[in-house]
Amino acid sequence: MTRPIRHQYEDLMRLVATQGAFKADRTGTGTKSVFGHQMRFDLNEGFPLVTTKKVHLKSIIQELLWFLTGSSSNHWLTERGVTIWNEWARADGDLGPVYGVQWRSWPTPDGGHIDQIAEVIKTLKTNPDSRRIIVSAWNVADLDKMALMPCHALFQFYVAPATEAGGKGKLSCQLYQRSADIFLGVPFNIASYALLTHMVAQQCDLDVGDFIWTGGDCHIYSNHQEQVALQLGRAPFAYPLLHIRRKPDSIFDYQFEDFEFLDYQHHPAIKAPVAV
């Protein structure tokens, strides 16, 4: 089957580049920004990996696996050749109670902890119609302890019932990203949560539906404008296909080698500085 060529991401990039308002920002770099945007990706049409530049799949996969360990240590990533968190890591490699800590070990007032990911899997298996299948990384009490406050802050799962007898439900995921670095960050975020949706669907014996990305402050940094212009001059290809080689015993048992991306056609990588 011929896969369609989608360009939601490039459309957002073009919108911000042409209509964004000039704003100052925390890093002192300066941005062009729009507020509020949504993209919907049908995961049955292909895996939404940006094709107008090469995206570093190893970093995306390993970062997601790191989140799922619940670790706060950058050493876990650097030991696997991933350096995307180096700019924020403290001298001892610790990053504070960032994404994985909140996902797996949200602290409660009585001294306990909540494993939000385990709760998601449990609820999807026992009560898939629930409207409370949500994971939040935005823990207000912990924000000042984090090396970087969560950009992708909250996500929710939704199961559409099977349309025929004996069929499977379809799992969709919606992410709210309060701060969206369009050039560097968003391609990673789309792919990361699309991958997580596939993994959760496999663990819960569901088919995949849509991944919906909702952005708050959607911005292009002033020192990314040349790179954005180059990328917008390229024609996108069809998205690749994802093959998960095995079904592990739990959502926490996946390994890097479990994921294979087929027919990933892409333009060359484009380097750009990260705003810290």
Swiss-Prot record:
<dbReference type="Pfam" id="PF00303">
    <property type="entry name" value="Thymidylat_synt"/>
</dbReference>
<dbReference type="GO" id="GO:0032259">
    <property type="term" value="P:methylation"/>
</dbReference>
<comment type="similarity">
    <text>Belongs to the thymidylate synthase family. Bacterial-type ThyA subfamily.</text>
</comment>
<feature type="binding site" description="in other chain">
    <location>
        <begin position="178"/>
        <end position="181"/>
    </location>
    <ligand>
        <name>dUMP</name>
    </ligand>
</feature>
<feature type="active site" description="Nucleophile">
    <location>
        <position position="151"/>
    </location>
</feature>
<feature type="binding site">
    <location>
        <position position="181"/>
    </location>
    <ligand>
        <name>(6R)-5,10-methylene-5,6,7,8-tetrahydrofolate</name>
    </ligand>
</feature>
<dbReference type="GO" id="GO:0004799">
    <property type="term" value="F:thymidylate synthase activity"/>
</dbReference>
<comment type="pathway">
    <text>Pyrimidine metabolism; dTTP biosynthesis.</text>
</comment>
<feature type="binding site" description="in other chain">
    <location>
        <position position="26"/>
    </location>
    <ligand>
        <name>dUMP</name>
    </ligand>
</feature>
<keyword id="KW-0963">Cytoplasm</keyword>
<dbReference type="GO" id="GO:0006231">
    <property type="term" value="P:dTMP biosynthetic process"/>
</dbReference>
<keyword id="KW-0489">Methyltransferase</keyword>
<dbReference type="InterPro" id="IPR020940">
    <property type="entry name" value="Thymidylate_synthase_AS"/>
</dbReference>
<feature type="binding site" description="in other chain">
    <location>
        <begin position="219"/>
        <end position="221"/>
    </location>
    <ligand>
        <name>dUMP</name>
    </ligand>
</feature>
<keyword id="KW-0545">Nucleotide biosynthesis</keyword>
<keyword id="KW-0808">Transferase</keyword>
<feature type="binding site">
    <location>
        <position position="275"/>
    </location>
    <ligand>
        <name>(6R)-5,10-methylene-5,6,7,8-tetrahydrofolate</name>
    </ligand>
</feature>
<dbReference type="InterPro" id="IPR045097">
    <property type="entry name" value="Thymidate_synth/dCMP_Mease"/>
</dbReference>
<comment type="function">
    <text>Catalyzes the reductive methylation of 2'-deoxyuridine-5'-monophosphate (dUMP) to 2'-deoxythymidine-5'-monophosphate (dTMP) while utilizing 5,10-methylenetetrahydrofolate (mTHF) as the methyl donor and reductant in the reaction, yielding dihydrofolate (DHF) as a by-product. This enzymatic reaction provides an intracellular de novo source of dTMP, an essential precursor for DNA biosynthesis.</text>
</comment>
<dbReference type="GO" id="GO:0006235">
    <property type="term" value="P:dTTP biosynthetic process"/>
</dbReference>
<feature type="binding site" description="in other chain">
    <location>
        <position position="189"/>
    </location>
    <ligand>
        <name>dUMP</name>
    </ligand>
</feature>
<dbReference type="GO" id="GO:0005829">
    <property type="term" value="C:cytosol"/>
</dbReference>
<dbReference type="InterPro" id="IPR023451">
    <property type="entry name" value="Thymidate_synth/dCMP_Mease_dom"/>
</dbReference>
<protein>
    <recommendedName>
        <fullName>Thymidylate synthase</fullName>
        <ecNumber>2.1.1.45</ecNumber>
    </recommendedName>
</protein>
<dbReference type="InterPro" id="IPR000398">
    <property type="entry name" value="Thymidylate_synthase"/>
</dbReference>
<comment type="subunit">
    <text>Homodimer.</text>
</comment>
<dbReference type="InterPro" id="IPR036926">
    <property type="entry name" value="Thymidate_synth/dCMP_Mease_sf"/>
</dbReference>
<feature type="binding site">
    <location>
        <begin position="131"/>
        <end position="132"/>
    </location>
    <ligand>
        <name>dUMP</name>
    </ligand>
</feature>
<feature type="binding site">
    <location>
        <position position="56"/>
    </location>
    <ligand>
        <name>(6R)-5,10-methylene-5,6,7,8-tetrahydrofolate</name>
    </ligand>
</feature>
